[in-house]
Amino acid sequence: MKDFAFEKVQHIEDENIYRVSNVTDIYETDLFDDYNRNVDNLSLLFHEMINQFIVHVDKSEEKNLKEELDSKNISYTVFDLGRKNIFFVFDSIPRTEVSYIIKMFYGVSIENTWAIISLGNSVDIKLEKINKSKFMECLTGECFVPQIKLVPSSACVFIQFDGALLTIAGNNLDICAT
């Protein structure tokens, strides 16, 4: 579709980090080495379908992101679960800011920061603690990841491996058909 060549796969590559339930179809495609080409293709694919966006940020980025979003009048909710567990959730994205959100999604994903776009109907998002050994928890602190529960006619999109792989997990929302 568009410039991307999607392949249907059986499971999400890293299911421990990308926790998505009620999935009927999963598609993947390799992204290009060209930032503008990827952003343009993402915009063509998802511009009319974006519903929600969630991004994980470092504590040092929280204030700047808040200021930037406030200047654009984009509403958001912040979940600050301590240390490195800060999530911005956007439940309503103005159509005028969809391009900005797509660029942010791609930009933070290629830096190995966690971000997900939801498409179609609203999905249920809960933050879930990853179980680690007490020793690892003392070293790195608690770690939370969003758990996404899809509903019919919804999907979520994320980029893995420092911007190399685009994954779409859907529930009867066929956006990859050619």
Language-model region placement:
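Structured alpha/beta or helical-core interaction and ligand-binding surfaces enriched in interleaved
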Residues: 1-165, 169-178
